[in-house]
């Protein structure tokens, strides 16, 4: 029996030395130490031995078992270390090689233009005011002198949440909130998103950006309005840009006007973009209607003011020569990477 145990030990050692993988080690373990393994069978047969042989053989069998278990454990560790070394060698990074450049995004042309517009007005002493995009009917229409039956209040032009709440159609409500909460003199701009129930095409979008401005003080005249907007146009588009004012109608200003600028495509020569006129509509403006001032508890006999409003998307298109507003919202990297 002792000779058989020595044979098992030597056989196991030889097989372990020749093993190259964890799977082979597991096969050897099962062969000798498993439930039906060779060493296990000998241990189960010890009952047939004499009382004198049993403790001697049992001691040798346990020593062989412990030796095989320890040898398998060491072999597992050696193979694991070899695999780790091979993996590290294959995964070695050459730190002298140039790294991969991180893809860095760029600022959107809308954001760039908004910042330029803000900077110009801030340099002229304007403050920036904000307000909610979900607005009360009172602020979006009533306080701006837009009556119940006005066409702009129809569902074809306005997104209604309920009878009293709308998605703001302009940033003018911010002007009302500012006049309610601040005393003149007031000199502010209100940039932000607005919503109109428009079909999407090259010049229309249901969501777009607008910037409105308001000045209220004693002795404000249309000349102040004209000078402010002409200065803005020159700083935004260059000293060569020309502007002109045309009479218009807005319910919240009186008198009202629209300001045109020389076409950014043809420089005033006439083209398809400006329909041959050499001019492009830039903004709406006018003197604040006396009733709007009264609605905000400002006495129109003491104070006067002017207001104006830009479509920021239109400004972007003019500044960069873009002929389709949809390009600003489609997240096409071929387009956005140009800025």
UniProtKB/Swiss-Prot annotation:
InterPro entries: aa-tRNA-synth_II, aa-tRNA-synth_II/BPL/LPL, Phe-tRNA-synth_IIc_asu, Phe-tRNA_ligase_II_N, Phe_tRNA_ligase_alpha1_bac, Phenylalanyl-tRNA_Synthase, tRNA-bd_arm. The gene is pheS. Tetramer of two alpha and two beta subunits. The keyword Protein biosynthesis applies. The keyword Nuclease does not apply. Gene3D superfamilies: Bira Bifunctional Protein, Domain 2. Its EC number is 6.1.1.20. NCBIfam families: pheS. GO terms for biological process: phenylalanyl-tRNA aminoacylation. One of its GO terms (molecular function) is tRNA binding. Its cofactor is Mg(2+). It comes from Clostridium botulinum (strain Loch Maree / Type A3). The lineage of its organism: Bacteria, Bacillati, Bacillota, Clostridia, Eubacteriales. Belongs to the class-II aminoacyl-tRNA synthetase family. Phe-tRNA synthetase alpha subunit type 1 subfamily. It comes from the Bacteria. It holds the Pfam family tRNA-synt_2d. It catalyses: tRNA(Phe) + L-phenylalanine + ATP = L-phenylalanyl-tRNA(Phe) + AMP + diphosphate + H(+). Keywords: Aminoacyl-tRNA synthetase, ATP-binding, Cytoplasm, Ligase, Magnesium, Metal-binding, Nucleotide-binding, Protein biosynthesis. Mg(2+) binds at residue 254. Binds 2 magnesium ions per tetramer. One of its GO terms (cellular component) is cytoplasm. This is Phenylalanine--tRNA ligase alpha subunit.
């Amino acid at each position: 029996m002792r000779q058989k145990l020595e044979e098992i030990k030597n056989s196991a050692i030889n097989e372990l030395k020749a093993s190259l993988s964890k799977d082979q080690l597991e096969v050897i373990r099962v062969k000798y130490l498993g439930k039906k393994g060779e060493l296990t069978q000998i241990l189960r047969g010890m009952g047939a031995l004499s009382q004198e042989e049993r403790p001697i053989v049992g001691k040798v069998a346990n020593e062989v078992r412990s030796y095989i278990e320890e040898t398998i454990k060491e072999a597992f560790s050696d193979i694991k270390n070899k695999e780790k070394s091979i993996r590290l060698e294959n995964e070695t990074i050459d730190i002298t090689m140039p790294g991969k450049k991180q893809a860095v995004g760029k600022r959107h042309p809308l954001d760039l233009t908004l910042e330029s517009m803000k900077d110009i007005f801030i340099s002229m002493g304007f403050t920036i005011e904000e307000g909610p995009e979900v607005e009360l009917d009172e602020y979006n229409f009533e306080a701006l002198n837009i009556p119940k039956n006005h066409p702009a209040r129809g569902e074809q032009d306005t997104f209604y949440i309920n009878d009293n709440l709308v998605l703001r159609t302009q940033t003018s409500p911010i002007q009302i909130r500012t006049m309610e909460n601040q005393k003149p003199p007031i000199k502010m701009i209100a940039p932000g998103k607005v919503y109109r129930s428009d079909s999407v095409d090259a010049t229309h979008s249901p969501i777009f950006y607008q910037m409105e401005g308001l000045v209220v003080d004693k002795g404000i005249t249309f000349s102040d309005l004209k000078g402010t907007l002409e200065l803005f146009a020159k700083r935004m588009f260059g000293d060569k840009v020309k502007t002109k004012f045309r009479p218009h109608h807005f319910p919240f200003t009186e008198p009202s006007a629209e300001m045109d600028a020389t076409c950014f495509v043809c420089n005033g020569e006439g083209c398809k973009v400006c329909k041959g006129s050499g001019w492009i509509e830039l903004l709406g403006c006018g003197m604040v209607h006396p009733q709007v001032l009264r609605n905000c508890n400002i006495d129109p006999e003491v104070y006067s003011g002017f207001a104006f409003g830009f479509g920021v998307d239109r400004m972007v298109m003019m500044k960069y020569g873009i002929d389709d507003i949809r390009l600003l919202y489609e997240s096409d990297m071929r387009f956005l990477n140009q800025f």
